């Protein structure tokens, strides 16, 4: 590739980031060194892999799952599969129609892959999950048996004590934020709209032993830019910057919007908290990667 071609091709589409165009299945993989016999299971990863070979941003592009199965001290297989979404087969399908209606079955499901309650789910924060088989074939859109009304963040949190899966979905129209809780058995048992100021892009959140923590930050959805194919998010100096703390619900007590305590913080954006916990004094500590601002469009 020439220097000119490398300059013209975005970094997320060249070199090690370039899309993989073949689906491969391989068995009895060669191993350098040794794999402990006790290490057994599947390692899966998800990422943007545009089938067309082009995407405007590395957040875009069709989802592709790569997987390796380890068992009995051997690497049993490797395979990679596109997540067979509507967006893959109907690239021009719009999740948001001109009238503002939203179809959450449309999405690239390219950000994360999780296992919970016997389900393997490929996630993207704009849409419903996609269920996969153990061999990484796509089963289809999964909406918790019709109970899920919001999108599902690509970064849900699994409680190691209860086995519950906590997640949220943000919306371009009210309700702008919905908190959801799934039992260890895989049933959606709680959905709570949470009041935030506007259509903010909430990429991630935190849970601690006793609390759920939301970040209501000044990167907001821009409907007009979305309709013209531009970057649909922008920085808004007038949007309040807040962190919300809500007690976690239990079998005996349910908490929701009225129980959220909001704290004003300095303007910033956070994609991901690395850790959140309660110290011995009961204070909540959050470790985050903090940007002073993001996607300003002056």
Predicted regions mapped to residue ranges:
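Beta-propeller domains
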Residues: 1-298
């Amino acid at each position: 590739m020439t220097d000119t071609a490398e300059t013209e091709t975005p970094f997320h589409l060249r070199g090690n980031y370039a899309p993989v165009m073949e689906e491969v299945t391989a068995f009895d993989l060669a191993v350098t060194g040794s794999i402990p016999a006790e290490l057994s299971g599947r390692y899966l990863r998800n990422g943007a892999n545009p089938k067309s070979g082009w995407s405007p941003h590395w957040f875009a592009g069709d989802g592709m799952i790569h997987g390796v199965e380890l068992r009995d001290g051997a690497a049993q297989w490797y395979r990679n599969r596109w997540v067979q979404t509507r967006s893959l087969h109907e690239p021009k399908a719009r999740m948001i129609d001109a009238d503002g209606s939203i179809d959450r079955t449309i999405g690239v499901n390219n950000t994360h892959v999780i296992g919970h309650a016997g389900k393997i789910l490929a996630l993207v924060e704009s849409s419903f999950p996609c269920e996969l088989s153990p061999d990484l074939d796509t089963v289809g859109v999964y909406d918790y048996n019709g109970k899920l009304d919001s999108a599902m963040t690509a970064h849900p949190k699994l409680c190691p004590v209860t086995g519950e899966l906590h997640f949220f979905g943000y919306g371009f129209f009210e309700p702008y934020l919905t908190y959801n809780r799934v039992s260890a058995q895989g049933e959606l048992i709680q959905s709570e709209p949470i009041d935030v100021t506007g259509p903010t892009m909430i990429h991630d959140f935190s849970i601690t032993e006793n609390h759920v923590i939301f970040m209501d930050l000044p990167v907001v959805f821009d409907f007009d830019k979305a309709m013209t194919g531009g970057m649909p998010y922008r920085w808004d100096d007038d949007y309040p910057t807040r962190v919300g703390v809500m007690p976690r619900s239990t079998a005996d007590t349910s908490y929701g919007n009225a129980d959220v305590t909001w704290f004003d913080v300095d303007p910033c954006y956070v994609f991901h908290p690395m850790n959140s916990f309660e110290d011995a004094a009961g204070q909540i500590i959050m470790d985050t990667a903090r940007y002073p601002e993001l996607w300003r469009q002056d």
